[in-house]
């Protein structure tokens, strides 16, 4: 794998905080869409002995009060009710977005409270100065609305993390590199100039969630504080990094953030069943390094990623980037070793799909964003 030139957290000696406990991983494993993914990610990080270089922090479970800093009481109470009863056919569930892609399975409330608690715990570690980087790979569920589940997301832990960070940090930058538009986070902060949201995502007719065109820039006091970068299928590392760096350079200068929340969904990676972007962890790693060189308090979250082995490869590689470690190409023997066949290596090779992103169109988008950011004061 490409070598991080120096520890990405150089300049401060505090090790990153890594949110983990066996109980936490076990409950995160229960999400129907990504079964056992949390275990696969943690096991690979452990197989490379990266956990030994981080401060492992056991997450608290989010209280009803903490979750209600964003979500409505009515939604949380309904989620708790159907979770206890395992009632998938409750008549009120549809209005709360429960069903189809967010089934109201038994125990789903406990899952949501665990994830929310993981991200809040990570944010609190940053507030308390225990670290400069805090990692919750099981977080990053960016589609949930205040009163509605959406897109496999029952609780918007990213919003809860940002709200917690706002207790200390005046201006927070949210950067979303998932394949899908970070609509729930953008909506939550669309009227404020204290949180800037930046999302690079696939934007195409019929592709979920259907929002996030470049003309979506925020509302009221928050106008120009939402930045959307619509991207087409087939994009690879070099072009993606060029876009990401160009946008973040302008955003940083205009907004001057005091803390960063970075959502690193791995559904952009070649081999994902979404079959859209054609990225590798190296490209995402370069974007991550670009953010880390600001040396701000940084909260790292996961997100999508439906090829489970590739998601574990990606987030393990990115953990190595944060630590400034080069990882051996050969996957070490561990519990899930057989999932990494037939080659058993950490690298992911892009597929042969065409890149649908025309250079002139990309330049148009970048110019448009640069123009909008002139309004940010």
Swiss-Prot record:
Activity control note: Its activity is inhibited by trichostatin A (TSA) and butyrate, 2 well known histone deacetylase inhibitors. histone deacetylase inhibitor.
GO CC field: chromosome; cytoplasm; histone deacetylase complex; nucleus
Needed co-factor(s): a divalent metal cation
Record's cofactor remark: Binds 1 divalent metal cation per subunit.
Disulfide bonds: none
Broad class of where this protein is predominantly found: nucleus
Region (Histone deacetylase): 14-324
Enzyme's top EC category: hydrolase
Record-annotated active site: 143
GO biological process: chromatin organization; mitotic sister chromatid cohesion; negative regulation of protein ubiquitination; regulation of protein stability; regulation of telomere maintenance
EC numbers, comma separated: 3.5.1.98, 3.5.1.-
Post-translational modification: Phosphorylated by PKA on serine 39. Phosphorylation reduces deacetylase activity observed preferentially on histones H3 and H4.
Catalytic activity, as annotated: N(6)-acetyl-L-lysyl-[histone] + H2O = L-lysyl-[histone] + acetate; N(6)-acetyl-L-lysyl-[protein] + H2O = L-lysyl-[protein] + acetate; N(6)-(2E)-butenoyl-L-lysyl-[protein] + H2O = (2E)-2-butenoate + L-lysyl-[protein]
One Pfam family per UniProt: Hist_deacetyl
Molecular function GO terms recorded: DNA-binding transcription factor binding; histone deacetylase activity; histone deacetylase activity, hydrolytic mechanism; histone decrotonylase activity; Hsp70 protein binding; Hsp90 protein binding; metal ion binding
Subcellular location: Nucleus; Chromosome; Cytoplasm
Residues reported in the UniProt entry to bind substrate: 101, 151, 306
Residues at which a divalent metal cation binds: 178, 180, 267
Keyword Iron: no
InterPro entries in UniProt: HDAC_PDAC, His_deacetylse, His_deacetylse_1, His_deacetylse_dom, His_deacetylse_dom_sf, Ureohydrolase_dom_sf
Residues where Phosphoserine is found: 39
PANTHER family (UniProt xref): HISTONE DEACETYLASE 8, HISTONE DEACETYLASE HDAC1-RELATED
Designated name of the protein: Histone deacetylase 8
The organism of origin for this protein: Mus musculus (Mouse)
């Amino acid at each position: 794998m490409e070598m991080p030139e120096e520890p990405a957290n150089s300049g401060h000696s505090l090790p990153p905080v890594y949110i983990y406990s066996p109980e936490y991983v076990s409950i995160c494993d229960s999400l129907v869409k990504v079964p056992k993914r949390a275990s696969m990610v943690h096991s690979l990080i452990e197989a490379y002995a990266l956990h030994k270089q981080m401060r492992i922090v056991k997450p608290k479970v989010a209280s009803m009060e903490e979750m209600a800093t964003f979500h409505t009481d009515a939604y949380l109470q309904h989620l708790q009710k159907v979770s206890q009863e395992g009632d998938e056919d409750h008549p009120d569930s549809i209005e709360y977005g429960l069903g189809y892609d967010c089934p109201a399975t038994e125990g789903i409330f406990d899952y949501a409270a665990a994830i929310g608690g993981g991200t809040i715990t990570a944010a609190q570690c940053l507030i308390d100065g225990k670290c400069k980087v805090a990692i919750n790979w099981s977080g990053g569920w960016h589609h949930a609305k205040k009163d509605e589940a959406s897109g496999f997301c029952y609780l918007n832990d990213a919003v809860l993390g940002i709200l917690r960070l706002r207790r200390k940090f005046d201006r927070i930058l949210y950067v979303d590199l998932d394949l899908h538009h970070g609509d729930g986070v953008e909506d939550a902060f669309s009227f404020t100039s204290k949180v800037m949201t930046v999302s690079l995502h696939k934007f195409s007719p019929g592709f979920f969630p259907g929002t996030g065109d470049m003309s979506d820039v925020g509302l009221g006091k928050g106008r120009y504080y939402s930045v959307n970068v619509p991207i087409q299928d087939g994009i690879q590392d070099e072009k993606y990094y060029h876009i990401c760096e160009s946008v973040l350079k302008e955003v940083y200068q205009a907004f001057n953030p005091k803390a960063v929340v970075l959502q690193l969904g791995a559904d952009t990676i070649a081999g994902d069943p979404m079959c859209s972007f054609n990225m590798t962890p190296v490209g995402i790693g370069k974007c991550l390094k670009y953010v880390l060189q600001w040396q701000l308090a940084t909260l790292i979250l996961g997100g999508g990623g439906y090829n489970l082995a590739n998601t574990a490869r990606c987030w393990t590689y990115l953990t190595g980037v944060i630590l400034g470690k080069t990882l051996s190409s050969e996957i070490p023997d561990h519990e899930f070793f057989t999932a990494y066949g037939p080659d058993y290596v950490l690298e992911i090779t892009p597929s042969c799909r065409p890149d649908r992103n025309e250079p002139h169109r990309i330049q148009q988008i970048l110019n448009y964003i640069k123009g909008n950011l002139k309004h940010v004061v």
